[in-house]
Every structure is written in C-alpha cells, then in structure tokens.
C-alpha cells in the first residue's frame, strides 16, 4: 500500500464517518468504528465515552445539521493513521447545543486489512 493512497483513503473515511453520523447510518458506522473505540471530550464528560455510548448517541441523541472539515492533516505510520483536523458543526445532543469549532485528533488502525477509527479526542476552539 502506498503512503499517498493510505492518506487519501483516511481523508475520505474521516469525512464519511461524519456523513454516516449525520445520516444515522448505523450499519456503516458499525463497520467504521472499531471495537474498543474511545471518545474523549473534556468539555462534555470527564471520562472517555465508550464505543457503546458513542453508538447510542449516533443512533438517537446526536443530531448533526451541518459539518465541515476546515483543515485536515493525515499522518500514516504503518497500520496506524493519525488525523489532526479543524472541524466545525451545527449540532446538538438531546437538548445541549454542540455547535462550535473543534480541534480533533482521530486515530485509525488498519484491522484485518480495513481502516477503523479507534479513538477521538475533541477540544473546543470557539
């Protein structure tokens, strides 16, 4: 696999992940989000969110009206991809407004030949 192809694949998958969240495409999210996935956002919760919690939010409470990756840098280290991005969204979780600009760090791993996201860290910029 070439480094350029891995970077392009990860950039495409990063955007697809949020598009599938917005569409509540749970079947595709099950494929993209790895077992053991963790989400950390100190501005929301003091402890990491589990995969199960993330998927439940995707299923019912987290509504993305619109989103944009304003900047994305993709690094690949063998079977690990690290994506640093500036991301904005108009969204809410149940009654909480989550519309803002964020700095995201996402970690993807090539597991059994396909990329899956294993971790996300989110910090509010706006």
Role assignments for model-derived ranges:
Residues 2-32, 36-126:
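A beta-strand edge to alpha-helix "cap/lid" segment located at domain peripheries
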């Amino acid at each position: 696999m070439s480094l350029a192809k891995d970077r392009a694949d990860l950039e495409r998958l990063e955007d697809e992940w949020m598009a599938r969240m917005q569409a509540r495409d749970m079947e595709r999210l099950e494929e993209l989000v790895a077992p053991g996935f963790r989400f950390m956002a100190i501005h929301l919760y003091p402890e990491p969110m589990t995969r199960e919690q993330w998927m439940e939010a995707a299923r019912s409470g987290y509504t993305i009206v619109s989103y944009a990756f304003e900047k994305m840098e993709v690094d690949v280290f063998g079977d690990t991809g690290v994506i640093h991005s500036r991301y904005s969204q108009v969204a809410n979780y149940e009654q909480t407004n989550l519309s803002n600009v964020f700095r995201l760090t996402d970690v993807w791993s090539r597991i059994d030949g396909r990329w899956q996201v294993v971790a996300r860290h989110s910090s509010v910029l706006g």
